[in-house]
Amino acid sequence: MIETSDIFNLLHNAVEAKNIGKKISQAKMAEDLDVPMRTYQDWRLGNSKPQAAAAVCKLLCELDDDEILFVVNKMRKLLGK
């Protein structure tokens, strides 16, 4: 079973890879997510496990690739990105 910390580490690394490997600090990522840096650190270390993250991951795993892209694009629009 995947741990919540694995989800956050995978996503953090994917965002860094998107930026051509340019490191993104935990402080910057926390700011972008609008959470305290300590909270984000705890998520990555597995000290705190937001239940919603695991639930969202499980839901996304139920979708096909094209359905995931559709959902992500909808979320981008809602976030204004």
Regions found by a protein language model. Name each.
Residues M1-K22:
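A short, Lys/Arg-rich alpha-helix, primarily the initiator
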Residues G21-Q41:
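Short alpha-helical DNA-recognition segment
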Residues D34-M37, S48, D64-D65:
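Short alpha-helix boundary/capping elements
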Residues K22-Q26, K49-P50, I68:
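Alpha-helix N-cap/helix-initiation sites
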Residues D65-K81:
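Short, charged recognition helix plus adjacent turn
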Residues M1-T4, C61-D66:
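Residue-centric detector for conserved, function-critical "anchor" positions
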Residues L45-L59:
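Short, basic-rich loop-to-helix N-cap that marks the start of a DNA-contacting helix
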Residues L33, R44, V72-M75:
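A general structural motif at alpha-helix termini
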